């Protein structure tokens, strides 16, 4: 969900997931029920769950909360981020650039998630991190829309590079501004998609 592997409307069957992960259905069911409580999944009949469809209204509610919480996390992280964490972020930026060039959707989404979450973890505020991860679980499935309908010439990695450079220079306000611009830029793009695209039927 965090990386966007599962898309809005997609049905998840407990037995299938348990088989994929090589475990019994019971722990999978417990984990998925926690995600239902977080609002990241919706329960359905016949032991299946569904990734909620994203509506314009819901996205408009999530976006400003994300911008404020994730911006705060960057501001806190900038003062304490380690050299090892900066190196991890650098690797993410470089791999995202390669993924964009090769049009590798899953690779880009995976490193995009890692970049943001490693950065936010550096804030060392568990309460803030839990809130951010809860929001990411709700919007992650919608990230696929960047690649199914977007022109890959969009500024998909520029804000990450700007944030990294600011962190390396010790400029916390600039790092926060870069992440907030990243969220707002793509938030506006996705809101436009929601305005243009009719709801789709759930994937089987």
Which residue stretches match the model-derived regions?
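Amphipathic alpha-helical interaction elements
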Residues: 6, 33, 78, 120-124, ...
């Amino acid at each position: 969900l965090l990386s966007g592997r599962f898309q809005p409307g997609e049905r998840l069957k407990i037995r299938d997931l348990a088989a994929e992960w090589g475990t019994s259905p019971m722990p999978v069911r417990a984990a998925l029920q926690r995600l239902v409580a977080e609002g990241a999944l919706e329960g359905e009949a016949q032991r299946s769950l569904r990734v909620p469809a994203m509506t314009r209204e819901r996205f408009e509610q999530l976006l400003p909360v994300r911008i404020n919480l994730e911006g705060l996390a960057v501001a806190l992280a900038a003062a304490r981020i380690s050299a090892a964490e900066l190196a991890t972020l650098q690797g993410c930026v470089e791999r995202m650039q390669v993924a964009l060039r090769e049009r590798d959707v899953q690779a880009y989404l995976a490193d995009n998630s890692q970049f943001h979450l490693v950065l936010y973890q550096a804030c060392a505020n568990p309460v803030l991190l839990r809130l951010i991860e809860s929001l990411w679980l709700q919007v992650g499935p919608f990230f696929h829309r960047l690649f199914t309908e977007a022109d890959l010439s969009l500024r998909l990695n520029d804000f990450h590079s700007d944030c990294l450079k600011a962190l390396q220079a010790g400029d916390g306000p600039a790092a926060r501004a870069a992440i907030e611009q990243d969220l707002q830029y793509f938030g506006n793009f996705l809101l436009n998609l929601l305005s243009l695209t009719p709801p789709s039927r759930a994937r089987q």
